[in-house]
Amino acid sequence: MALKTQLLWSFVVVFVVSFSTTSCSGSSFQEVNALHSYVDHVDDKESGYNSRAYPSYTDTIEGLKVMELIRPRTQLFSSRKLNTITGGIATSSAPAKTISVDDFGAKGNGADDTQAFVKAWKAACSSSGAMVLVVPQKNYLVRPIEFSGPCKSQLTLQIYGTIEASEDRSIYKDIDHWLIFDNVQNLLVVGPGTINGNGNIWWKNSCKIKPQPPCGTYAPTAVTFNRCNNLVVKNLNIQDAQQIHVIFQNCINVQASCLTVTAPEDSPNTDGIHVTNTQNITISSSVIGTGDDCISIVSGSQRVQATDITCGPGHGISIGSLGEDGSEDHVSGVFVNGAKLSGTSNGLRIKTWKGGSGSATNIVFQNVQMNDVTNPIIIDQNYCDHKTKDCKQQKSAVQVKNVLYQNIRGTSASGDAITLNCSQSVPCQGIVLQSVQLQNGRAECNNVQPAYKGVVSPRC
């Protein structure tokens, strides 16, 4: 029994360090090879620690094949790969044709270049074969643009210069995005250029800064990728978003790497990377410092991998919020491996609303260093914004199950190191802390009995 338990946990360690890393100067496409089949041979009846009320991670792993669920299955894109020298596209067919936004009238001199970008996109998207649309090394001012597909071409958007948002809030009206790529398959967006949302005018008028009417005006997201499958976004600077910097929504097979995402610490709601209803996504080798979550993962997202992430300032790496207004939300297969968080308000957070339903399951946080983080490890199944919601009568909750924290180090800035605030009606299950050492803080656990492995400090 002890041997099988030891082998299982050895497998977990092998699994979580076996992911390939992304080189910011090389290919983004690397097939992940994990020894996921081993778990099929483990008998959960001999898995060691057991609690009827709070099943352990090793109890619940069998049958669910949790590591297989977590494993991102990012596929090699058909007949395409990143050129390791130029960062461009190499195909087995004829060389890609290159066009520039300047060919369609863009000036890059402070004038409105929106129509030139629209015309250039239509030309590139409607062409056959491989196309590279270049944004030269100038500053281009553009209004909201929808880059729509499907495209006939295998399309690369190569940004050398800076794309800047207009500061005129009136042009957005009811538009909740600035740049949106919709239904574009096999798209590659690469730098080394910059996307600048010029968000200061929006921040000054947000409800958090100016609560008086008309503060309810919804600020747009800087860059949205919607229904984009087999997507690569690499080597870009994205800064000062009006609200969220980058959203991946309704996408399958995404590689986002070597991104620098920045905004002032006091800029409201400026999440770095937001993942919603997206499957098989890898975020790697990126530096994120904003006024909200560095990475937020919400409902419908599965097999999400984040590796080599530097986070701060901001609100940390967050799963949720889930279950707002009684909704049913699901997130599964999240793997965070190799993160450094400094001065953030939260570190590794799972947040669900009282009264919601659904699940957040099969989650691994591995190899994380946190320095002066206010809430380094936090699960909150009882979240409620009492200013706008009445949650007193709510009994249901989003299930939080099968969560592993492994090799976590750092310091708390608040006196709180580990907070597991689980629901009384739907308590957390399968919470495991292994080799966790957080200084300057205490641990508090409600409605959960975590399993400890190795040196864990503090403990509940």
From Swiss-Prot:
Glycosylation sites: N280, N421
One Gene Ontology cellular component annotation held by this UniProt entry: extracellular region
Intracellular or extracellular location(s): Secreted; Secreted, Cell wall
A Pfam family this chain is assigned to: Glyco_hydro_28
Major localisation: secreted
Catalytic residues identified in the record: D292, H315
Keywords, ordered alphabetically: Cell wall, Cell wall biogenesis/degradation, Fruit ripening, Glycoprotein, Glycosidase, Hydrolase, Secreted, Signal
GO term, biological process aspect, one: cell wall organization
Reaction catalysis annotation: (1,4-alpha-D-galacturonosyl)n+m + H2O = (1,4-alpha-D-galacturonosyl)n + (1,4-alpha-D-galacturonosyl)m
Sequence similarity: Belongs to the glycosyl hydrolase 28 family.
Stated name of the protein: Polygalacturonase
Annotated source species: Malus domestica
